[in-house]
């Protein structure tokens, strides 16, 4: 299915998917995925934006998904007299947790299964002085023979 790129911009500070937790209840282990910390709200917002931008059926072809995660600056990173460039984000959340939350949120809206996402880049940055925190997701199909080396 030839397709133009789909670009989604999700406003707000990026969030990572919390890792599954295990607890012992009555001598039995029970595993659950925590959903606090705004995760459910982020997923709902991402799904709403995706449904507005992409109105076709969920894709069932190999996909490339690139993600740019722009985090807010801390007070210690604020400058008053000089331009503030983007900085690499070297603290949590880990990039795999950021990616997992985005892929899970868009499953069933943009693609049938996140296993269809075969490649893509991720970048975590701290916002430049004039940037707002956000997550930018760029989705494109992979043409036959077009896989990256």
Give short role names for the model-derived ranges.
Residues 1-149:
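Acidic, proline/glycine-enriched N-terminal capping motif
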């Amino acid at each position: 299915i030839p397709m133009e790129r789909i670009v989604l911009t999700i406003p707000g500070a990026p969030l990572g998917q919390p890792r599954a937790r295990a607890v012992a209840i009555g001598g039995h282990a029970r595993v659950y995925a925590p959903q606090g910390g705004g995760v459910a709200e982020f997923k709902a917002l991402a799904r709403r934006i995706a449904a507005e931008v992409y109105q076709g059926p969920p894709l069932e072809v190999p996909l490339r998904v690139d993600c740019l995660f722009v985090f807010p600056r801390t007070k210690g990173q604020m400058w008053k007299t000089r331009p503030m460039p983007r900085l690499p984000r070297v603290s949590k959340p880990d990039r795999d947790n950021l990616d997992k939350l985005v892929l899970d949120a868009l499953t069933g809206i943009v693609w049938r299964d996140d296993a269809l996402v075969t490649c893509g880049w991720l970048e975590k940055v701290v916002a430049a002085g004039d940037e707002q925190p956000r997550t930018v997701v760029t989705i494109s199909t992979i043409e036959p023979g077009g896989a990256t080396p």
